[in-house]
């Protein structure tokens, strides 16, 4: 896990049930394992009010969400690439985990993987993009010994 530097900011009232940094590194490493650069990612874990504010300011959506990704993708010095920031909402992730009957760890993994793929340029603005991203998320989750998060549709 030498090719990743993760900075974590804990910015919520209750830090209980947040995965350890080692887990975030393991999940992100699965995606970046073939990258030769040292990749830097900041993860900020927040409450609903902060993610709602960010979602409105950057996406004009006045509601909380589980994750926001802010890609940067610039070299800050030789072989050091600042990929960007992930802002994860602890409360939303916990609620979704219960709602969709997923283990909390698995859902944290999925949302982190989803956000990291956004940092790398993947998106889901249309059915084709969504299918590509969901297949990749399923493959990565299975490789980490979690269940597939998506049931894929045929278009």
Curated annotation (Swiss-Prot):
Names of the cofactor(s): Zn(2+)
MF term (GO), any: RNA endonuclease activity
Biological-process GO terms, alphabetical: rRNA processing
Record-linked InterPro entries: MetalPrtase_cat_dom_sf_prd, YbeY, YbeY_CS
Cofactor note: Binds 1 zinc ion.
Positions annotated to bind Zn(2+): 114, 118, 124
Catalytic activity, EC: 3.1.-.-
Keyword flag Chaperone: no
EC class of the enzyme, as a word: hydrolase
Subcellular location: Cytoplasm
Keywords: Cytoplasm, Endonuclease, Hydrolase, Metal-binding, Nuclease, Ribosome biogenesis, rRNA processing, Zinc
A single cellular component GO annotation: cytoplasm
Recorded family membership: Belongs to the endoribonuclease YbeY family.
PANTHER family, alphabetized: ENDORIBONUCLEASE YBEY, CHLOROPLASTIC
Functional note: Single strand-specific metallo-endoribonuclease involved in late-stage 70S ribosome quality control and in maturation of the 3' terminus of the 16S rRNA.
The protein's name: Endoribonuclease YbeY
Source organism: Buchnera aphidicola subsp. Acyrthosiphon pisum (strain APS) (Acyrthosiphon pisum symbiotic bacterium)
């Amino acid at each position: 896990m030498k090719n990743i530097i993760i900075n974590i900011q804990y910015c919520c009232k209750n830090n209980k049930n947040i995965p350890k940094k080692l887990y975030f590194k393991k999940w992100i490493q699965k995606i970046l394992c073939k990258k030769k650069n040292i990749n830097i990612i900041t993860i900020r874990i927040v409450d609903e009010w902060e993610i709602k504010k960010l979602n409105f300011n950057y996406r004009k959506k006045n509601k909380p969400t589980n994750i926001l990704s802010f890609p940067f993708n610039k070299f800050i010095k030789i072989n050091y690439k600042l990929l960007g920031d992930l802002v994860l909402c602890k409360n939303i992730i916990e609620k979704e985990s219960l709602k969709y009957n997923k283990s909390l760890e698995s859902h944290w993994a999925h949302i982190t993987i989803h956000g990291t793929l956004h940092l790398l340029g993947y998106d889901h603005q249309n059915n084709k993009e969504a299918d590509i991203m969901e297949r990749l998320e399923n493959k990565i989750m299975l490789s980490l010994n979690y269940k597939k998060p998506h049931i894929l549709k045929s278009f």
